[in-house]
Design a protein with these regions (language model features):
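Conserved nucleotide-sugar donor-binding
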Residues: 87-99
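Catalytic beta-strand/loop signature of glycosyltransferases that borders the donor
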Residues: 82, 137-143
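Residue-level signal for well-ordered alpha-helical positions
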Residues: 32, 54, 100-101, 160
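A C-terminal functional module that forms or caps the active site or interfaces directly
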Residues: 99-133
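Conserved core of the sugar-phosphate nucleotidyltransferase
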Residues: 1-87
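Hydrophobic alpha-helical segments
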Residues: 127-135, 160-167
Length: 177
């Protein structure tokens, strides 16, 4: 609802007006392997300053770390690091930007590594920020993110959803027939 309220209260002006929900990194990690997250820097006004997709973040004990060289070196990330889980609020302007940037992305990246060539949404958002074409309001969440990255994550996620249903946060039947 917060993203809807933000987008409903503004429209694109001299800059595209977008929004995103950011989570604390530690609330998004799995015990079962590495994850990809958009690591965010937020300015004093609560706007996204930049976002860098880190495609291999792992928990090592109580520390979250990422590597960009297949594990040869690791960089620490603070537990309060804000990350994107791709919960974005865009105006329709994002569609033309995604379309315009897709073919150049493929031309640059497809021949290098076709099996790992992924068009990450945060890459486009970061380009728009650097070009001064967009402003992204960051809505911070303190909630835990539940997702199934690995099959071993499924039980934890289903147990968490059941707990939310038992606690009254969700109805007993989420999807009525």
């Amino acid at each position: 609802k917060a993203i809807y309220d933000r987008l409903a209260s503004c429209g694109d002006d001299d800059k595209y007006q977008y929004a995103m929900v950011a989570y604390h990194l530690y609330n998004t990690l799995t015990e079962n392997g590495h994850v990809a997250r958009g690591v965010c820097t937020v300015d004093a006004d609560g706007h996204l300053a930049d976002i860098h997709e880190r495609t291999r973040i792992e928990k090592h004990g109580d520390q979250a770390e990422y590597t960009e060289d297949d594990g040869a070196t690791w960089e620490k990330l603070g537990e309060d690091t804000l990350v994107s889980m791709n919960l974005w609020g865009f105006t329709s302007s994002i569609l033309k930007e995604l379309k315009a940037r897709f073919v150049p992305f493929l031309e640059k990246n497809l021949s290098v590594n076709p099996l790992k060539c992924e068009y990450f949404l945060p890459f486009v958002v970061d380009e728009l920020l650097k070009e001064g074409k967009a402003e992204v309001t960051v809505l911070k969440s303190v909630d835990r993110w539940y997702g199934v990255t690995y099959k071993e994550d499924k039980k934890m996620v289903t147990d968490a959803i059941q707990g939310m249903k038992d606690g009254g946060l969700y109805p007993k039947k989420l999807w009525e027939e």
